[in-house]
């Protein structure tokens, strides 16, 4: 949805600032003034995300898309016969009652003069809101399910609103789209396998209670209060029957006025925010026409951060509908960066009390494939737990090859059941960087691939499904939702278009080049095979088998058996554990990534088996309290049969 100050056009710039300055292994990204959540949603693929906004309707959008890692099941609704909640909410019949707040106050019903919605659409919105409240009160939907359905409604409302852009005023005649019927569309939910968290608090109060690695700050720039422009979305979200006033039916918002919109308060508020920020890396988006001057922001950042790390990036832009072209050309969007002298959040724990030395470098190569369950965020905890010297390293469930590419071994064998992924990696291994980049850029030009050309994307997807050329798959992924790959039961690529988010950006190109260059320097053999068919007899006591199988007690597209590839079940788990026992009897090293518990479930089979070996607890996700774990988090572990770790 359109939102004042949206950073959709600056996502690549933000990414590049992070790439240039964040050289350590950051895990936790916080978007403190999230709005509709476009920034947090974009970086959800790379980090555990904390998001916050003081507006409740924004908070609902965040909770639905950031905190949810999948589309909810609505199991309780199904028990009462409602299998498709959206269809029910769109089509169920109702009668207008005195409870229908929008109908009575924002549509031409019973003499009301306001024309924000037609009576048909206003009453449908009222029916949906009352129904969602009832379902929630009757425990038919939980908090995340409520947020998901309400977020869908909030995102649908602007398409049938009789406004020019914001809700500061309604049109005096009916716009064509306002006469259309309210349509509810499912949300695209990305899964990063982290316990993401959303907040609905004042930023300056919240900053004293949270911590992480990267803090992104995008405060209001001027005296314009967002609440007045989006008062109707706030009322729909809260549905609290406010005492409205004025011609446009504003809700009271004196207490909601942001300090960042007040000239006398903004300096102190920003200074407090930076001073209290318990984050190592801080990025600030601002504008040259904002209340704070560039020099003021620089001074505050340097007073609380490391002055030598200060950076400013200026992006010129044309002021929307400006009549003063010269003045508009001098406007800039800023991104400020500073580093604070604060440690990162990551740590390694071992129940055997084995001292783990720091790995030689904090810089790890990242796979260009956004593979579900990828271990890039855990590399700084996993790699130091590998033996000092490895002859042959077997990456038995290699996936996107995040682990194997970062291991020092005389020989690396990477196996995976997904033929298409193996072919992409093998092609990159056998092809020069120049040829790979040239191929990608040819396809981009040929199909007109961009963040907005969905038709070009679909045409290219159809072409790939007919030809199955490996580098075309990678190119396709670059323009797909969340940069992920997904196949149906016919093994056809079916991931949707990543509108306004995904593209082969300079930052992505840089990552790809680094990965291929590292790949060419290693002695790697890629093999498409099921794990039990690997020839383990070729291994001896100087070798290491690393296993990152699908997790038995979690669900994902990689282990549900519904994507044209073999599923993962208890029998598969037993086979793998038997193989590892056999390797141990031969004196061959192994390391197994897995989870002992997840969202209240325990892998009892693994818990019992692991007692024979060394269990190292990894910090997979982070709470915002003084404790390391919270209810519902995954207990991520690395299980090894050796103790001679990298020093």
Curated annotation (Swiss-Prot):
InterPro entries reported in the protein's UniProt record: Ade-mod_methylase_MStsI (IPR012186), Ade_MeTrfase_dom_2 (IPR023095), DNA_methylase_N6_adenine_CS (IPR002052), MeTrfase_D12 (IPR012327), SAM-dependent_MTases_sf (IPR029063)
EC category: transferase
GO molecular function, one term: S-adenosyl-L-methionine binding
Protein name: Type II methyltransferase M.FokI
Organism: Planomicrobium okeanokoites
Record NCBIfam families: dam
Family membership noted in the UniProt record: Belongs to the N(4)/N(6)-methyltransferase family.
Keyword Transcription regulation found: no
Motif (Adenine-specific methylase 2): 548-551
Domain topic, free-text comment: The 2 adenine-specific methylase motifs of the protein participate in modification of the two strands; the first motif modifies the sequence 5'-GGATG-3', the second motif modifies the sequence 5'-CATCC-5'.
Effect the entry attributes to changing residue 548 to A: Methylates only 5'-CATCC-3' strand. Loss of methylation
Catalysed transformations (reactions): a 2'-deoxyadenosine in DNA + S-adenosyl-L-methionine = an N(6)-methyl-2'-deoxyadenosine in DNA + S-adenosyl-L-homocysteine + H(+)
EC nos: 2.1.1.72
Chain positions of motif Adenine-specific methylase 1: 218-221
Disulfide bonds: none
PROSITE patterns, alphabetized: N6_MTASE
Key words of the record: DNA-binding, Methyltransferase, Repeat, Restriction system, S-adenosyl-L-methionine, Transferase
Assembly, per entry: Monomer.
GO biological process, one term: mismatch repair
Pfam families reported for this sequence: MethyltransfD12 (PF02086)
Keyword Plastid (UniProt): no
